[in-house]
Every structure is written in structure tokens, then in C-alpha cells.
Amino acid sequence: ALSIASLRTHVDFFSIGTNDLTQYTMAAGRENPSVSEYFIDDHPAILRLIELVVMESGTKPGSICGELAGRVDVIPKLLRSGIRSLSVASALVPDVKFAVRKIKVEDSINHVGIEK
């Protein structure tokens, strides 16, 4: 996530896997009961890393995959960060589409709402 500027000339797009990003950033695995409480995929640090990837990616399109992409409560923040593609389980598609359609894109550009 922090090296996207040096990688962007070598890729056509980027995809952020939020499960792995969260696990490595928070040093906590979802399946490990002794640390799973620290697996917080909508933590401000995770949202800031997503925003940094989008900002540093230039004109390369970006996508989010992982459990976070299907959380309708977080979708507005993801869109505000500049993400325009969400990869979710097929069962979540109707709810995600409904959540996205409720948001005005012009109100959701380049601001996650966290302090920098």
C-alpha cells in the first residue's frame, strides 16, 4: 500500500485486498481467537491506507475486495476515498448496489473523513 507510487508505472490497475491489508496492518488474524478482536477492517488506519493508495495511483483504476467491500456501512467512506469498484460475494450484490445508488458521487470524492 505504501509503495504504490513506485509500482503504478508497471500495472494497469490495482486491487486492494482488505482482509490481508487489515491482518498485516493490525497484526491480527480473523481466525485467531487470541487477537481477532484487533481485526478491525474499518479502522482509521486501514481507511487511510486505502485513501493513500488511491491518491498515489495516479490515473490507474482501483478496486476493493475482501469483507470490507461488502459492508454497506463503510461503502460511503470507500467511495469518498476514490474507490470506484467493489468486488463482493454474489449474495451481497443487491445490498451493495442499493447502498451505492443512495450516494451522490460528487459528494463522495477524495475525502474519507479522517484526520491526516
What is each model feature region?
Residues 1-116:
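Conserved alpha/beta-domain cores
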